[in-house]
Amino acid sequence: METAYSVKNIPIRLTYERWYHIIENHDDLASYFHDVLDTVENPEFIMQGNQGTLKATKNIGKKKWLVVIYKELSEEDGFIITSYFLPGKPKGKIIFATVQFLINQ
């Protein structure tokens, strides 16, 4: 198990079981383990997801956005649910954004 810390400094777990689930369904992510963790810790922006989830998002190349869905259960615990690539900037309600992201808009 690996842990990343969200922008609210909450530890977010990525278990090996979850990682295997992610790469089983999204094999294009197989070499992006550390990028998934880094996206939770250093997202360009975070969107509100469904059922209390959050979507940490980072642009990692031309027309390539990494999205990590996670849930903060408490101030001391959270976990990654899944992750995937999108060909364009995700749409949704932004609840956090870096200054650099806002400048580039």
Report each predicted region and the residues it spans.
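Ribonuclease/tRNase effector modules and their secretory precursors
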Residues: M1-Q105
